[in-house]
Amino acid sequence: MPIDYAELHCLSCFSFLRGASQPAELVQRAAELGYRALALTDACSVAGAVRAHQAAKETDLHLIHGSEIRIHQGPLLVLLAPCRRAWAELCALISLGRSQARKGDYRLEREQLEGTLPHCLALWVPDDAPHDAEQGRWFARHFGDRGHVAVALHHGPDDEARLQRLLALADRFRLPAVAAGGVLMHRRGRRALQDTLSALRHRRTLAAMGTALECSGERHLRSLHSLARLYPPALLRRSVHLADQCRFSLDKLRYEYPAELVPAGETPASYLRRLTLEGARRHWPQGMPDKVAHQVDHELALIAEMGYEPFFLTVHDVVAFARRRGILCQGRGSSANSAVCFCLGITAVDPARQSLLFERFISKERGEPPDIDVDFEHERREEVIQYIYRKYGRHRAALAATVIRYRPRSALRDAGRALGLDAATIDRLAGSIQWWDGKRVDPERLREAGLNPDDPRLARTVAIAGQLLGLPRHLSQHVGGFVISEGPISELVPTENAAMAGRTIIQWDKDDLEALGLLKVDVLALGMLSCIRRAFDLLAGFRGRRLTLADVPAEDPAVYRMISDADTMGVFQIESRAQMAMLPRLRPQTFYDLVIEVAIVRPGPIQGDMVHPYLRRREGLEPVDYPSEAVRGVLARTLGVPIFQEQVMQLAVVAAGFTPGEADALRRAMAAWKRKGGLGPFRDKLLKGMRRNGYCEDYAERLFRQIQGFGEYGFPESHAASFALLVYVSAWLKCHEPALFTCALLNSQPMGFYAPAQLLRDAERHGVEIRPVDVRHSDWDCSPEHRGDGEPALRLGLRLVRGLNRRAADRLIAARGRRPFRDVQEMARRAALHRRDLETLAHAGALRGLAGHRRAAWWQVLGAEAGLPVFEDLHIEEAAPALDAPAEGEDLVADYTSLGFTLGRHPLALLRPQLRRRRLLTAADLASTGHGRLVRTAGLVINRQRPGSAGGVTFLTLEDETGQINLVVWKATAEAQRRTLLAARLLMVSGIWERKGAVTHLVAGRLEDWSDWLGALDVRSRDFH
């Protein structure tokens, strides 16, 4: 007689630090073993449900959705959702439990289950506790004929006695008994990993766990024959009978967007059309261009057909709120392909000036929801988030989750803790690897860290860390993806508290939402928008000139000259090493050149061998040819080279006969082929289609190779155009208002590639007068001050003083506003400043105007005490002793410690005599050095970068008193001198100086760490992946 079984109690790794297998692994294994069904029942969670759902679609396995719930001081239950209403009940219960506990935990009382789960099926998992009788009575009374007793047998010595006890309990309370394995892993081989997770959950070492570990390795998916030897046939049959009652699938979820934004008497479609046309009239008072009018009609018809009008209205409402509050915002990504989004004010890409491909945004054939990403000022985005919560209520709006997974360092740290390694060893072990090392731990790296790779405990740590890699550790919040629903969101998906106060998240991430076709609004943060808005405000205040993104003077030759000279420190998107190297070669002269510049310095075009052909054609070194007029129509604006995702899609349509939906499927496959494969069928279809349309084999193959390159991350043109606008605006501000732009940049930190030290030196090179932090003049923010010639000087703000309390600064500014300070004592009394605040200001040199040099300021601080308001008019004169001023080096160290920069001489200017004796060249010397020369130089390391697309090459920027030096370190050199490369603050480099046109760099040979020369100087680099 065939054996049939459904596993009804199974935890995946989304029961964090309990389950040791991915949902897909459990589904695939259950299907391999011939199970009828599998219930994924993670602890108070459905975070892994969508992944299991997708995996089950690839098999014949019937997937059941449920959750394990431990009642506070009560029984352990497994709740199953047989229908859509039961799913809503389960999600609401999980949401309630999560809302009543700290992040990562849950709490539910018995009475909270009573009457709330009328459609759920339930399994009671007895604990072998003296409370079984009382718990059984409650369970039977509450669940009645929907309740069952779960029987879990794991080849223990008392299995027979346990079976009889559980059957007796079932009989006593007239509940059917059913086999259920309490599964924690898909195969027995995960036992060591599961033990490690248990130790981490209990915050103990494995050695100290004792009986807290599972008593056997049997909590895995077992063969049907193994189960048949353990369980009475009736219990196995009942598992199938119960599974057959559960017909709910996530495919049955239907999502409704809020409709309350639609005025009475209108439909969502009519209201969206009205708003779109009103926006069009603002942009084109003389009437929409025919091309745009046709595009708008086409988009509105498709939006109506897909039922997406409420989604567009919601995004419009959020953007309109931001604009009413003066919060700068701009849509980006594929939504910038939409003329409707432009008319609604969501995006800034003018459809009359750009070539849009709406199918990149919405495709009927794809049948998936559109994705609208809107960037807001990073420091004011919270206002937008809280507006959404107020507008729709927390019961209808929540942020998507992000799954935080184990990466190499965190895996090594947790594995080391579980195995009882001491903290110092764990630090050395984790510090021995970098992100680019991947999963492998090189024994040589361990030796460099002073560890013995042959130590058995260390080897075991590395092995367990390898198993931890990729497992989810916990849920965090998405950067800004909001799900907003017509009804309670907790009936669609459970919600829980985020770590950040005032935030609620759902238990699914963006990939889960996309898989189920659920819409989200991306409310993202962008530091450059904060900077630009601040710069606009400063411009209005200083010059009385009010600008917006739309009316910054366009196509300014001076701006393009500055960009072509790679004078772009601080400019959005084009301040990186790679962009600065490209700018003198591409030499942008128009806005569309900026669109190309943004897109071309990306892994996609680089890997697809598109960059050099484009540059050669732009320079006239290579002819531009098109195999057909149709291809010319797609590629003429990029000189015959496909640079944007939309171009690849259009080529597939015009050259290979793809439908727009098939072209979008190709685009999606491009993005995932390295992870999932799947480009093979598209290759065949593309090559056959192009041959059929008369294109030669070589051209078709070349196009396919370029498409593969886009799998390394190619930009949509619409996204590049959105970013190019911010590139131009920030470049215009830098070109024409360098003081105000630098001021705005400093007030928007942290952001960008460069620290304030580099931004300030760059501003000085542009003729900006920098005035120091001074308690007599500085506000919290940096601010412009009038010079004699009508131009602004830049006064540094108190925000730059490390460790200064904002409330103390506000008190100081308020007291100064009433009348100026006479000395430090009076300031301390009137502003109620504490000794620590005064010491911080003295160390930063901010008391120089009241007390003189740092030592004199320190002396006055020692005699100052914070006062009460009643004494603020009291002034006591006390003579200060004559103290020698600090040496220049002492001031330099204090500047860097308290501010991170100096307005005095650069540190290397002080070291230059010693460096000259060693024949080390400056950045200025190198600027006039010929190509191919062997040179030696040294500089402060200000940033390190190792892009994933660079084949292991590391890029560094060094700085001395005369400028910056771009350093290229090939992979072999980097590995051979790894410690020096990563640790040096002052780096000496010997290598080959390379020059090609205006692009220069030093290819490193030998590296030496000269950081000892800096002593206590606190110099920090900004390091990037």
Swiss-Prot record:
Where it mainly occurs, coarsely classed, is cytoplasm
Tell me if Nucleus is a UniProt keyword of this record: no
Its EC number(s): 2.7.7.7
**Which controlled-vocabulary keywords does the entry list?**
Cytoplasm, DNA damage, DNA repair, DNA replication, DNA-directed DNA polymerase, Nucleotidyltransferase, Transferase
In which family does this protein belong, per the annotation? Belongs to the DNA polymerase type-C family. DnaE2 subfamily.
Query: What PANTHER family would the database entry show?
Result: DNA POLYMERASE III SUBUNIT ALPHA (PTHR32294), ERROR-PRONE DNA POLYMERASE (PTHR32294:SF4)
Q: What is this protein called?
A: Error-prone DNA polymerase
Origin species = Alkalilimnicola ehrlichii (strain ATCC BAA-1101 / DSM 17681 / MLHE-1)
